[in-house]
Amino acid sequence: MQAIISTAPGQAALVHDRPLPTIRDGYLLVKTKAVALNPTDWKHIEVTQKPGILFGCDYAGIVEQVGPGVQSGFQPGDRVAGFVHGGNSKEPQDGAFAEYIVAKADLQIHIPEHMSFEEAATLGVGITAVGQGLYQTLSLPFPSPSSIHEDGAEKPANPATQPILIYGASTASGVLGIQFAKLSGFAPLAVCSPDHFDLAERLGAVAVFDYADGEDAVEEIQDYVRGMGQPLLKAWDTISIPSSARFCGDALSSGNGPQYASLLSMTCPRPDVTSTTTMAYTVFGEDWGMGTAHFPASGVDAELGRRWWALVQQLLNEGRIQTHRIIAGEGGLDGVLGGLQQLRDSQVRGGKLVFRV
């Protein structure tokens, strides 16, 4: 089968003779229909040393076979999507960029009827990042039926409720983060480019701020928070670079234990702010590797992942979560490596690059 794998240190190529993966306990064998690209994909290629490791994390497809021990109600023929662990040196056959893949059942969803393969393929990494960042780390309450009216219409965000800062609000993770924070009863304050203000507001941000305004934007956030009458104690940074960490730290209110959560290893420079970095791959509950580094399994994170994806299934079925804007790539798996170069060169903005397989 076709697959994008490591061929030498820091290099990857599309091959045409990759064997089908072996299905493991708790896993599904899936025929891939679409894949979406993330920065973590090209970063894994850069650090991978061994040949034969499959890349890619986001996909959608059709179940071909259900492995032993699967208790999640999947059957052959089901349309599914979710999160797989591409670039994993401990399990080289895990990954998304192939015609057939294996996917841990606990971290997958049945694709709702109203959703296309391409839309569903955008979810995996972002959904997992939201679960770990907003809920496991920043301790937002899980969305519940109380966040909607009896007639099914969403309640508007209450301007008097507790604010949360989402930096990088137009990224795939940020777009989802706005929506989930709103469903959890928080008031999302979105930081992004002005080109994406309308998107952030449409998804539920109560206010939007231009990251390029720096200190002026920080002052605007502080003024807005004072008007709300609630301190800003939680910030989620989907960009996770020194300037974004500093921005978040400057914007957070003083006292009462302010928290900063990031997707990459980054620390808020303010000493009174608790900084936490999440690594999405811990939700698999298995030992894993990235390049030459190795990481232990986390049973706690695996249980969070299982519970979180079950809730996400319900919210998607109810149509309460919108996917990110799709940027259609060309060439199927043949086009993926070029797409990853586009990501690396910061040529993809305000949407998710998706390839039909």
Curated annotation (Swiss-Prot):
Transmembrane segments: none annotated. NADP(+) binds at Y211. It is an enzyme of class 1 (oxidoreductase). Its EC number is 1.-.-.-. It comes from the Eukaryota. Trans-enoyl reductase; part of the gene cluster that mediates the biosynthesis of the tetrahydropyranyl antifungal agent restricticin that acts as an inhibitor of CYP51 and blocks the ergosterol biosynthesis. The highly reducing polyketide synthase resH, the short chain dehydrogenase resG, the cyclase resF, the FAD-dependent monooxygenase resA and the enoylreductase resD are required to generate the first stable intermediate desmethylrestrictinol. This is Trans-enoyl reductase resD. It comes from Aspergillus sclerotiorum. The gene is resD.
